[in-house]
């Protein structure tokens, strides 16, 4: 894959692409534990960590039972998690890459699924709030692989080539492949939220290229 920097709009997924979503989850758990401590005087952080370690399917429901609270309180924990100020950062390498692309590429944008407020809080914490961001929660809940947000990016940056970088082959690459974009998958590790197994998927779902670090994009770029 060869990429012309000045003629390509770079579009990134957010979670498990620009940063590790597991870091956001850990940040949210800390925020809920802090809120519980302030309301009830009980330190539940170790309990929550134990639940996570043992793959508790209903973390906030389990917390209600642990605190002897009605299960209706579960929603308050969920919203505390969703609306907390995330303690997440970009790696220095990813900061430098995005700065380079913002300065020299034809365009730079983010396309991500999720709730508007939650995703915007993540972008702010990562220092990316100034970038054009196309969030499914702001577009009628049209999660990937719905093609409409990809088409909107093409309309915003017309007459260029487009590259989408994501991590989840189950949904990230089908639409841009169909729109004749270039697609690049970022291989993850055991901390990734979603599987990257592609053997069960039609090849139309596969990225055209795989990289192990975002910085490998620089090796694919032609000025």
Residue ranges, per PLM feature:
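Small/polar loops that bind or transfer phosphate-bearing groups
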Residues: 20, 110-111
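Active-site neighborhood of HAD-like aspartate-dependent phosphohydrolases
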Residues: 1-45
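Alpha-helical elements of Rossmann-like donor-binding domains used by nucleotide-donor carbohydrate transfer enzymes
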Residues: 27, 31, 62, 96, ...
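Acidic-and-aromatic substrate-binding clefts and catalytic sites of carbohydrate-active enzymes
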Residues: 51-54, 86-90, 141-142
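A metal-dependent, Asp-based hydrolase signature
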Residues: 35-38, 42, 49-83, 100
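Asp-based, Mg2+/Mn2+-dependent phosphohydrolase catalytic module
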Residues: 1-7, 102, 109, 115-223
């Amino acid at each position: 894959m060869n990429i012309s920097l000045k003629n390509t709009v770079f579009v990134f997924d957010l979670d498990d692409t620009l940063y590790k979503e597991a870091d956001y989850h850990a940040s949210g758990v800390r925020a809920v534990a802090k809120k519980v401590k302030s309301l009830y005087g009980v330190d539940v952080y170790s309990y929550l960590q134990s639940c996570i370690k043992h793959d508790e399917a209903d973390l906030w429901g389990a917390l209600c039972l642990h605190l002897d609270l009605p299960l209706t309180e579960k929603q308050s924990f969920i919203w505390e998690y969703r609306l907390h100020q995330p303690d997440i950062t970009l790696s220095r390498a990813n900061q430098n890459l995005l700065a380079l692309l913002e300065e020299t590429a034809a365009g730079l944008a983010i396309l991500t699924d999720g709730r508007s407020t939650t995703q915007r809080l993540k972008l702010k914490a990562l220092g990316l709030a100034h970038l054009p961001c196309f969030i499914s929660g702001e577009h009628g809940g049209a999660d990937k692989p719905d093609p409409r947000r990809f088409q909107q990016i093409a309309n915003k940056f017309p007459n260029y080539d487009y590259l989408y970088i994501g991590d989840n082959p189950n949904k990230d690459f089908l639409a841009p492949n169909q729109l004749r974009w270039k697609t690049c998958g970022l291989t993850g590790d055991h901390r990734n939220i979603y599987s990257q197994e592609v053997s069960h998927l039609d090849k139309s779902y596969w990225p055209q290229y795989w990289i192990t670090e975002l910085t490998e994009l620089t090796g694919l770029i032609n000025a």
